[in-house]
């Protein structure tokens, strides 16, 4: 959000470079409606860049997923893996990548820094930092006011798809987007209960999967069944776990299953 407000022209130039590399004449920048200032600014700026259109999007999670973006912006659906966006004539990049492309091409600047958001209810000074790769997350947390006393977990990434960190000395890398500090109350997990077959997770899944089945089969090591049930199509958005009234750790089990099935598929392909 801040990048679009402060580096709009640079992002648009980066998009033009990406369009030229992909040999396309049309580019879209999708922005959710809860960022009206960014939509207004980018729309005004984009008028000077032929072929680039700003598309306001409905606010819903996970709207930022590449398959969801392609469907929302150009109405094309990406088939199940191994299909990728290029199979439907699309390439998806985020504005951070577009800005990095601009700096690499126009300024001959390698990717050695990126914007990282440090936030949390108990933080004294939640901020966005321009951070060099390799910087320990502890330094960013100190710059944001230090680790609060009621810290329960430190999450690398966002609240839905992020992963808990064992310690704060984990370095920033090119894929780091943010650091979330959760207090004790937020970090506390409810005791998991048996699945009640309510199907809320099925309704919440943006990929049309059956998360309760994937989680149960993964917990029992039934890798053949979870592969058949398209576990590799899961985008790990966490919607299933968030909606589960039984507080089952479905995403944890599904990530385990994806890792196992991915290994099985690679071994199978290596034999061909």
Task: Spell out what each predicted region is.
Residues 23-137, 143-148, 158:
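Hydrophobic alpha-helical positions that pack around
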Residues 3-10, 30-34, 89-97, 128-132, ...:
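Catalytic cores of large soluble enzymes that bind and process phosphate-bearing ligands
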Residues 30-32, 55-57, 119-121, 132, ...:
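Generic beta-strand/beta-sheet core signal
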Residues 1-11, 99, 105-194, 198-202, ...:
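Conserved mixed alpha/beta catalytic, RNA-binding, or beta-rich assembly cores of soluble enzyme
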Residues 176-192, 202, 206-272:
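Ferredoxin-type iron-sulfur electron-transfer modules in oxidoreductases and energy-metabolism complexes
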Residues 1-74, 197, 231-232, 236-241, ...:
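Iron-sulfur-cluster electron-transfer modules
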Residues 58-60, 160, 184-185, 220:
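Short, solvent-exposed coil/turn elements at secondary-structure transition points
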Residues 12, 16, 39, 43, ...:
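Predominant activation on well-ordered alpha-helical scaffold segments within soluble catalytic domains
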